[in-house]
């Protein structure tokens, strides 16, 4: 492949619209160009990377026994009405009406379509287990598409769906997919972590996310320093550092004028904010049920856990709404005396508060707090549930010696045990061994194929550009001719390129009549694992300069040994 004959529109300046490094580098390296909000055209270099990711995903799905299909992007509304998601999914679902006034959607997922296919084609337990996958363009109408390919509206996804006769069989299918995902990300040569996750809007029982580790990641991952336990922050549980107990003190009403925040109250009373109680109002609008959520003052609320403990649509209400509904004093809210609120409230306390003594909480009176508050004596012990975000240094819930540490990741894969959610709603049944109809139990397994490209860049770059992992590099070697007008150097560069290609390597030959410095910058930007420089003083001395893009090390290799040396190096890297 010749640079001069390929569309690689590199940019010297950082695009002003790009916020994250992957978006900046994908634009600068000429991998993509934006067509509309969250919609991108993949140019030749970007498409080569995308296809390599796709190939690895396809190979491992095939090895795991999944069967490839291709389902329509446009889906009839009737299927989504059957599952109940037509109304539930919200504005992210792009809805379409055809000339006959029939409603459709552009599929963000394909649970309904695959369920319809299976109920039509699979009728007996003898046809199980069944696992179908596709690699296809999806569309989600994100309200604020950003970060380039990372959070676009149109994206390439691998989605798979398994159907089994019972939970034991689903466990096997789930394990096969879990292992296949580990193999995929290992082959992609990315640092990643599978973590336990909340099932979210798709629903279901068990769930794991696969995260590419990167400081720029949107998601926070909590993992144990000693064992394999890891979970998304939405799901993670940690054992809070215990507070020293103590003899219960008398409850005292203390004036705290103007002290409303946890930090202000703790400083004013000269005490550890861990002994203060954060009391939050929480409201379920569907049932008009009010809650008080209690946490240690040094902890933060996990809203996903709070919804799981109360209601899916519950949320923190606006302060003025809480004041109007409950008659409470903002900044001085407390659980003692909650029975006197204007409306009944249910109290839930985070598990970390279970054994805390001599707490401080609001007195439900402007300018006052209560100190020395203790369970049972001053207020009944409420229901204790996990409501908080894990903190760095918490104890591991799975092993004794481990502690939790927090890192950032980019979600690129997700596996779910869906259960009977769709099969029961849509009548996906087979005859079992006894000739009785039985609903199938489902799993679903997604990988963001295009997102992996952006995540790989977020993890593998430096100030000069991309550093591609070998498995997905658009080419393994870039041969740079310092001056294409020097016939000897040009002929040798073409010879080296041809010999490397004969050794089954993909090579980019930079034969442009450009300044050498500009070519070097483009080579670093494009990120090929190795760069071979042909020309200049080194070439006259009978050597080529070979640069390892990741380490930055430059070695002078005799011209006649360049091909053999590179073939050996790359063979060793591929084995590793």
From Swiss-Prot:
Keyword Transmembrane: no
Catalysed reaction equations from the record: tRNA(Pro) + L-proline + ATP = L-prolyl-tRNA(Pro) + AMP + diphosphate
Keywords: Aminoacyl-tRNA synthetase, ATP-binding, Cytoplasm, Ligase, Nucleotide-binding, Protein biosynthesis
Domain of life: Bacteria
The EC number(s) this enzyme carries: 6.1.1.15
Segments crossing the lipid bilayer: none
GO CC terms: cytosol
Swiss-Prot/TrEMBL GO biological process terms: prolyl-tRNA aminoacylation
Compartment annotation: Cytoplasm
InterPro entries: aa-tRNA-synt_IIb (IPR002314), aa-tRNA-synth_II (IPR006195), aa-tRNA-synth_II/BPL/LPL (IPR045864), Anticodon-bd (IPR004154), Anticodon-bd_dom_sf (IPR036621), Pro-tRNA-ligase_IIa (IPR002316), Pro-tRNA-synth_IIa_bac-type (IPR004500), Pro-tRNA-Synthase_IIa_type1 (IPR023717)
CDD domains: ProRS-INS (cd04334), ProRS_anticodon_short (cd00861), ProRS_core_prok (cd00779)
One of the record's GO molecular function terms: aminoacyl-tRNA deacylase activity
Protein family per UniProt: Belongs to the class-II aminoacyl-tRNA synthetase family. ProS type 1 subfamily.
Function: Catalyzes the attachment of proline to tRNA(Pro) in a two-step reaction: proline is first activated by ATP to form Pro-AMP and then transferred to the acceptor end of tRNA(Pro). As ProRS can inadvertently accommodate and process non-cognate amino acids such as alanine and cysteine, to avoid such errors it has two additional distinct editing activities against alanine. One activity is designated as 'pretransfer' editing and involves the tRNA(Pro)-independent hydrolysis of activated Ala-AMP.
Record note on domains: Consists of three domains: the N-terminal catalytic domain, the editing domain and the C-terminal anticodon-binding domain.
Subunit-structure text: Homodimer.
This protein's name: Proline--tRNA ligase
Origin species: Magnetococcus marinus (strain ATCC BAA-1437 / JCM 17883 / MC-1)
């Amino acid at each position: 492949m010749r640079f001069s004959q390929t569309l690689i529109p590199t940019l010297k300046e950082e695009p002003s619209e790009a916020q994250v490094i992957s978006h900046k580098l994908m634009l600068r390296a000429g991998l993509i160009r934006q067509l509309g909000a969250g919609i991108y055209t993949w140019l030749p270099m970007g498409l080569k990377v995308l296809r390599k990711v796709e190939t690895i995903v396809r190979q491992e799905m095939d090895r795991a026994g999944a069967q490839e299909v291709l389902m329509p992007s446009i889906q009839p509304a009737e299927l989504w009405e059957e599952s109940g998601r037509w109304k539930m999914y919200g504005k992210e679902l792009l809805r379409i009406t055809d000339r006959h006034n029939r409603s459709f959607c552009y599929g963000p997922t394909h649970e309904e379509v695959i369920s319809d296919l299976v109920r039509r084609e699979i009728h007996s337990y003898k046809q199980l287990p069944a696992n179908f996958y596709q690699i296809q363009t999806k569309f989600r109408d994100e309200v604020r598409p950003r970060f380039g390919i990372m959070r676009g509206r149109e994206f390439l996804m691998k989605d798979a769906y398994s159907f089994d006769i019972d939970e034991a069989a689903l466990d096997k299918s789930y394990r096969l997919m879990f292992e296949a995902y580990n193999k995929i990300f290992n082959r992609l040569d990315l640092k990643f972590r599978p973590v336990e996750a909340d099932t979210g809007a798709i629903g279901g029982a068990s769930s794991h996310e696969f995260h590419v580790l990167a400081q720029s990641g949107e998601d926070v991952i909590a993992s144990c320093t000693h064992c394999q336990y890891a979970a998304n922050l939405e799901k993670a549980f940690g054992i809070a550092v215990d507070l020293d107990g103590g003899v219960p003190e008398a409850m005292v009403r203390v004036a705290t004028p103007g002290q409303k925040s946890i930090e202000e109250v703790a400083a004013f009373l000269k005490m550890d904010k861990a002994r203060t109680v954060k009391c939050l109002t929480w409201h379920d609008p569907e049932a008009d049920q009010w809650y008080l959520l209690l946490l240690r003052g040094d902890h933060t609320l996990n809203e996903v856990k709070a919804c799981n403990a109360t209601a899916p649509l519950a949320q923190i209400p606006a302060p003025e709404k809480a004041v109007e509904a409950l008659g409470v004093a903002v900044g001085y809210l407390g659980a003692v005396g909650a029975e006197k609120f204007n409306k009944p409230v249910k109290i839930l306390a985070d598990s970390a508060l279970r054994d805390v003594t001599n707490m401080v909480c609001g007195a439900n009176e402007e300018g006052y707090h209560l100190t020395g508050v203790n369970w049972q004596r001053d207020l009944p012990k409420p229901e204790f549930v996990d409501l908080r975000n894990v903190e760095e240094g918490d104890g591991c819930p799975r092993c004794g010696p481990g502690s939790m540490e927090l890192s950032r990741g980019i979600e690129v894969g997700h596996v779910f045990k869906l259960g009977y959610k769709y099969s029961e709603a849509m009548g996906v049944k087979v005859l079992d061994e006894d000739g009785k109809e039985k609903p199938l139990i489902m799993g679903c397994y997604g990988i963001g194929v295009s997102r992996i490209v952006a995540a790989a860049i977020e993890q593998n770059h430096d100030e000069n550009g991309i550093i591609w992992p070998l498995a997905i590099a658009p080419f393994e070697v870039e041969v740079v001719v310092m001056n294409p007008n020097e016939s000897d150097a040009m002929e040798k560069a073409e010879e080296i390129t041809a010999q490397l290609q004969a050794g089954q390597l993909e090579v980019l030959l930079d034969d442009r009549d450009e300044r050498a410095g500009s070519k070097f910058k483009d080579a670093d930007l494009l990120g090929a694992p190795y760069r071979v420089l042909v020309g200049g003083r080194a070439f006259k001395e009978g050597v080529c300069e070979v640069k390892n893009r990741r380490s930055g090390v430059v070695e002078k290799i005799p011209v006649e040994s360049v091909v053999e040396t590179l073939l050996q190096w790359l063979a060793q890297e591929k084995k590793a």
